[in-house]
Regions:
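Ferredoxin-reductase
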Residues: 2-91, 180
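Short helix-loop-beta connector
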Residues: 108-113, 206-209
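Generic structural signal for buried aliphatic residues
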Residues: 39, 95-98
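Short, charged beta-turn/beta-strand-edge "cap" motif at the junction between a beta-strand
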Residues: 44-48, 99-104
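Acidic/glycine-rich phosphate/pyrophosphate-binding loops and surrounding catalytic core
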Residues: 89, 111, 128
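Reductase modules of NAD(P)H-dependent flavoproteins
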Residues: 2-5, 145-247
Length: 247
């Protein structure tokens, strides 16, 4: 782990309240990380006290080397100090950061046949970073991957077109969007109405073949963890990361 400055080089809105930000290290050094890890951005509250926020790295690489750009997705919290900082950051602006951290990663010694990747909101970001690894594992080990992603409506389906395109390109990967409030105007084959547990139940989790990853809203993570345990998966087969909004 090290500390460094990041310079914003590009950004765009992914959804009405979610911004995609692409940074490069100010010193020009490529950023080495394992897909699934996160960074911390350091700043100060208005009273001068130091604080930090964690963001999963969403950069799509080959899964084994350093990358030039470090990409994150920031969900804005009303009155949030980090939200204000990153909403006002212009291209060329810098922030202090450290990392990488975390173990929410695909494990080299896994021997399962299928991965169930479950997310809500910006919790889908680490799975985007894993796409290079996923492509490799579908051929090297014959693994299958099912990404179950919950959003309230199509406009909040982050990186949805990327995942749809990847599913068309990689036969061992399937994408299952779940819309809890408003379905798409033009539904697609894998779309489901309701929460992620609906699609997950249809996938019939199997302790003999599956390892599950859960990332996003804490309630979703807890409820899905319970569902998977009821299906027979052991605790080591369920890997979790909760996203908690902070001001």
């Amino acid at each position: 782990m090290e500390s460094f400055k990041l310079r914003l080089v590009a950004s765009h809105m992914l959804a009405p309240s979610v911004r995609h930000l692409a940074f490069e290290r100010a010193d020009g050094t490529p950023f080495a990380f394992v897909p699934g890890q996160f960074i911390q951005i350091h700043f100060h509250y208005a009273d001068g006290s130091p604080t930090k926020r964690s963001y999963s790295v969403g950069t799509v690489g080959n899964g084994s080397g350093a990358v030039q750009r470090l990409e994150i997705a920031v969900s804005y919290v009303e009155g949030g100090a980090a939200s204000a900082l990153l909403a006002q950051l212009d291209e060329g602006g810098t922030v202090d950061a450290s990392g990488p951290f975390g173990r929410f990663c695909l494990h080299a010694n896994d021997n399962n046949a299928r991965y169930l990747l479950v997310a809500t909101g910006t919790g889908v970001t680490p799975y985007r970073a894993m796409l290079g690894q996923i492509r490799t594992l579908t051929t090297s080990r014959g693994c299958r991957f099912a990404l179950v992603y919950g959003a309230r409506s199509e406009v909040e389906l982050l990186y949805g077109e990327e995942f749809e395109a990847f599913a068309r390109e990689v036969p061992g990967f399937s994408f299952h969007p779940c819309f809890s409030r408003v379905p798409r105007n033009v539904p697609r084959a894998h779309d489901r109405s309701g929460r992620v547990q609906v699609a997950l139940a249809e996938l019939a989790p199997d302790p003999a073949t599956d390892i599950a990853y859960l990332c996003g809203n804490p309630d979703m993570v807890d409820e899905t963890f319970a569902l998977l345990k009821e299906a027979g998966l052991g605790v080591p087969q369920i890997r979790r990361e909760k996203y908690i909004s902070s001001r």
